Amino acid sequence: AGDGNYYTGDTHWHPDGSWGELFAAKTAFYLDPLTRDTGAVRLIPGSHRPDHFVRKEKIDVNNSLELFGVPLTEFPGSIAVETNPGDIVIFNHDLYHAAFGGGTRRRMFTMNCTRQAKTPEDLEVVNRYLSVHSPGGYNVKTGAGMFNPTMVDTADENRMIHLRQPIEIHDQLFPDLARHVVNGESTAEESALP
């Protein structure tokens, strides 16, 4: 899944998942220069691990003023990753992240990447993941199901190896958003599911 966004203002602390393992990663492509004062992404290093104090103690990091006497921007151990146009930041979906002071112009593209499901357990995790982190999960109609039409229409077989499984799972989860339903196409793809 991925998106292009035009952010304004603050994005409070949150993880994009709680998988407890490296299952998904977010790749953010920045289009504007961002500093700690103008909306740079902030990370809490190590917070993706189940044994990190934030997770172990079930700390609400957005309550830092009451808990630690510091504003959200100064959560203990957090860092700001300042970026320039063209910079890429990649992090584990379980990592707590935020952005503060974003003003009215904070443009970025993101891609959420997961590993291919090879076992029934992996397939269950991918289904849970795509039920939330996908066009259907966000209730966004792309006109082509899981991916923007250009992503699929320009894909050679090497790229389709990576796209086929999420497309099939997304179509099962959100059949009314499937490309063949939206565009009246037939699909005779061989299943990529385990």
Residue ranges and their predicted role:
Residues A1-P85, H97-R107, M111-R128, L193-P194:
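Non-heme Fe(II) oxygenase catalytic core, chiefly the N-lobe of the double-stranded beta-helix
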Residues I88, D94-P194:
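Non-heme Fe(II)/2-oxoglutarate
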